[in-house]
């Protein structure tokens, strides 16, 4: 924190000399407090690393189980695959304009999903219900190409696309997992805001094994995803607790430094 404040930026190459480093003055609390703060900071690093590792593990197994070659290794070399475009197997719709003011004025139990990716994409809850059943949503703007499986009553904003499977050969959950891998590849990043339009989504081609196998794979991935999410959700809670601890000690240190300065001024 302190060393960067003493870097000489007037040179062509900014530098911090050994002489200047030796002259930096630092205030220290008791060794016990120092060790406590160091432990909290170490925990931050460990939890962040674990969070990244959990997400990598899930992505690896998801991609492995959805790979055609691996499906044939597991379920049989002669397993047939059929290829469809999204428009051939789904009804494709888009949400409507739902403002934050509308959400405030029409509170209810049904979620409104938007182009947000945090909080499962939920913007708020209203009494309306535009969709009821098993669907897939995707973000069309901003964080475009993020796919969610939905099951129940909900609403979608205008930045959210909605798919309803109409082909009896297709498992909605399985399709959602496939699209989580494939949809981001079709995001248009040249615009000021990344986009994945209804037209582009409609043209995406995907290959499917028989329905029975789709359902087996989807059940495995759904259970694994839930397990990973439960673990991952526990990590941010731990991080938040550690942050509160760190804030406490930062405030303690600040007050301690101020007290030292006041005492020094009184002596002088």
Curated annotation (Swiss-Prot):
Give one GO biological process term: DNA restriction-modification system
Record comment regarding domains: Contains two DNA recognition domains, each specifying recognition of one of the two defined components of the target sequence.
Family membership = Belongs to the type-I restriction system S methylase family.
Q: What is its induction behaviour? A: Detected at low levels after 6 but not 96 hours growth (at protein level).
CDD domains hit by this protein: RMtype1_S_Fco49512ORF2615P-TRD2-CR2_like
Top-level taxon of origin: Bacteria
> Assembly and interactions?
The methyltransferase is composed of M and S polypeptides.
According to the entry, what is the taxonomic lineage of the organism?
Answer: Bacteria, Bacillati, Mycoplasmatota, Mycoplasmoidales, Mycoplasmoidaceae
Question: Can you name this protein?
Answer: Putative type I specificity subunit S.MpnORF365P
Question: What Pfam families does this protein map onto?
Answer: Methylase_S
Q: Which UniProt keywords apply?
A: DNA-binding, Restriction system
Q: Which GO terms describe its molecular function?
A: DNA binding
Kindly give the InterPro entries that the UniProt entry links to this protein: Restrct_endonuc_typeI_TRD (IPR000055), Restrct_endonuc_typeI_TRD_sf (IPR044946), Type-I_RE_S_subunit (IPR051212)
* Record has DNA-binding as a keyword: yes
Q: What's this protein's function?
A: The specificity (S) subunit of a type I methyltransferase (MTase); this subunit dictates DNA sequence specificity. The single R subunit has multiple frameshifts and is probably not expressed.
């Amino acid at each position: 924190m302190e060393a960067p404040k003493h870097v000489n930026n007037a040179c062509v190459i900014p530098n911090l000399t050994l002489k200047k480093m030796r002259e930096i003055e630092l205030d220290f609390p008791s060794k016990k407090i120092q060790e406590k703060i160091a432990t909290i900071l170490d925990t931050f690093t460990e939890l962040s690393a674990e969070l990244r590792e959990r997400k990598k593990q899930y992505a690896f197994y998801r991609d492995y189980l959805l790979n055609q070659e691996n499906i044939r290794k597991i379920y049989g070399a002669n397993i047939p695959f059929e290829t469809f475009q999204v428009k051939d197997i789904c009804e494709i719709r888009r949400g409507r304009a739902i403002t934050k003011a509308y959400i405030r004025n029409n509170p209810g139990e049904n979620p409104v999903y938007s182009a947000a990716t945090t909080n499962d994409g939920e913007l708020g809850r209203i009494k309306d219900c535009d969709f009821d059943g098993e669907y897939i949503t995707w973000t069309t703007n901003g964080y475009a190409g993020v796919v969610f499986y939905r099951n129940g009553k909900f609403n979608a904003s205008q930045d959210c696309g909605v798919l309803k499977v109409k082909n009896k050969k297709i498992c909605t959950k399985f399709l959602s997992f496939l699209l989580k891998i494939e949809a981001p590849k079709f995001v248009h990043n040249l615009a000021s805001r990344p986009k994945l339009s209804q037209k582009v989504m409609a043209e995406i081609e995907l290959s499917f094994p028989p329905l029975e196998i789709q359902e087996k794979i989807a059940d495995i991935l759904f259970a694994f995803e839930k397990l990973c999410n439960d673990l991952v959700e526990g990590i941010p809670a731990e991080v938040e607790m550690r942050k509160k601890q760190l804030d406490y000690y930062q405030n303690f240190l600040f007050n301690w430094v101020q007290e030292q300065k006041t005492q020094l001024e009184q002596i002088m």
